[in-house]
Swiss-Prot record:
The lineage of its organism: Bacteria, Bacillati, Cyanobacteriota, Cyanophyceae, Oscillatoriophycideae. It comes from Gloeothece citriformis (strain PCC 7424) (Cyanothece sp. (strain PCC 7424)). Transmembrane segments: none annotated. This is CinA-like protein. SUPFAM superfamilies: CinA-like, Molybdenum cofactor biosynthesis proteins. CDD domains: cinA.
Length: 417
């Protein structure tokens, strides 16, 4: 027995709004231990809606609809469900009274077309909407098929799910097991290389291990099905520990961890501070660091040294090196890092200089060439070269450059913790 999520609305197909409902419902189904293998998005078309229902009941026993419950002619979800199961609609007086009262509370008269929202299939139960005028239904139109409908407004859908849908599903025997996942995050290793390292773990059945790729990082999702969170964690933990052994310092965090949050935790642990000198990222590294609440404990500030004159005047970069090696070079990156550390008085100094594109590249210094400098508390400076590729756009190169700088600092801080 599994569920299928069906999101209704032409605006979803056109990309006018983000389909956050499917993400929420997918997470909630996992918490209840209800497997779901398909999510469908369909426009506001009666025949296509009925076609989707036909396909869905062939592969799922719980159909969860969002959207298409409004008062306008293109709100067709309830009508499509009723027609498919050849069941008439009837006006529910309690729903109609509730809608009328909600309009009265805001000093408005209910429009005639709102009566449409009081129509539900004969035999269906009402799924109340405390916040809006579009109630849903809970209906078992035939053996082995359960239908739940929700409005497309995320806040209304979530409230209805928590208050009514979860108790109903638990009453049907769901919720005795749960599906829990841990997302492990890695930098400095690609998805394919990571998959090779943990190849034997990808064959596990419970928990399962699956690789994913992100911009500049790779991930492994470990998913367990168990009767309790404690049991699920007991399945996940030994696999997680084995992955840590196999991947070493490439692992940087799990679940909601980010590079800025992890680096911030490290700096707090060692009671040290950092400052940044940026060229091609234009403040992006400082912005990342200050995303974290309380970052003023360890981030002192930065200098955006875009022009060579600023690199020389504020960071003390040697003019001869600028002339000989160019602004995008390891010697300049190292001097920028040491310069900002000394200028601001932080324990650590980080610098970034590179060619973000789309122009400015040459055969010897192509777009995507980036140098990072790290100055440590002892005044020792190390430089790192990255070639991020000529096909990436400017935003991606800038973002990856800032991430790589943070990752190099993270790795150095690991030695101190």
């Amino acid at each position: 027995m599994s569920a299928e999520i069906i999101c209704v609305g032409t605006e979803l197909l056109l990309g006018d709004i983000l389909n956050s409902n499917s993400q929420f419902l997918g997470t909630e189904l996992a918490k209840l231990g209800i497997p779901h293998y398909y999510q469908t998005v369909v426009g506001d078309n009666l025949e296509r809606l009925k076609q989707v229902i036909k396909i869905a009941i062939s592969r799922a026993s719980i159909l969860i609809f969002t959207g298409g419950l409004g008062p306008t002619p293109d709100d067709l979800t309830t009508q499509a469900i009723a027609e498919f199961f050849q069941t008439p609609l009837e006006e529910n007086p309690e729903i109609l009274a509730d809608i009328t009262e909600k309009f009265a509370q805001i000093g408005r008269k209910m429009a005639t077309n709102n009566r449409k929202q009081a129509l539900i299939p004969v035999g269906a139960d009402v799924l109340p909407n405390p916040s809006g005028t579009a109630p849903g239904i809970i209906w078992q139109p035939q053996e082995g098929v359960t239908i739940l409908t929700f409005p497309g407004v995320p806040s209304e859908m979530k409230q209805m799910w928590q208050q009514t849908a979860i108790p109903f599903l638990k009453s049907q025997g769901w919720g005795k097991e749960l599906i829990y996942s841990r997302m492990m995050r890695f930098r400095g290793i690609g998805e394919s290389a990571l998959a090779e390292k943990v190849a034997h773990l990808l064959e596990l059945a419970n928990p399962t291990v699956a690789p994913y790729a992100g911009l500049g990082e790779a991930r492994l999702r470990i998913t367990a099905k168990a009767k309790s969170l404690t049991d699920a964690m007991a399945l996940i933990e030994p696999v997680s520990q084995e992955i840590l052994t196999l991947t070493g310092d490439d692992y940087y965090g799990a679940d909601q961890d980010t590079l800025p949050s992890v680096v911030g935790q490290q700096l707090r642990q060692v009671a040290q501070t950092v400052s940044v000198a940026e060229s091609c990222t234009g403040g992006g590294l400082g912005e990342m660091l200050t995303q974290i609440p309380g970052s003023s404990e360890y981030f002192l500030g930065g200098i955006i040294a875009y022009d060579n004159r600023v690199k020389n005047a504020l960071l003390g970069v040697n003019q001869q090196d600028l002339d000989q090696f160019g602004a995008v070079s390891e010697p300049v990156a190292k001097q920028m890092a040491l310069g900002v550390k000394e200028k601001i008085g932080s324990d650590w100094g980080i610098s970034i200089t590179g060619i973000a594109g789309p122009g400015g590249g040459t055969d010897t210094k192509p777009v995507g060439l980036v140098y990072i400098g790290i100055a440590d508390p002892n005044g020792q400076v190390e430089g790192f070269e990255y070639r991020l590729g000529t096909r990436r756009d400017r935003l991606a190169i800038r973002y990856l450059s800032a991430c790589n700088a943070l990752d190099q600092l993270r790795r150095k801080l690991l030695i101190k913790i």
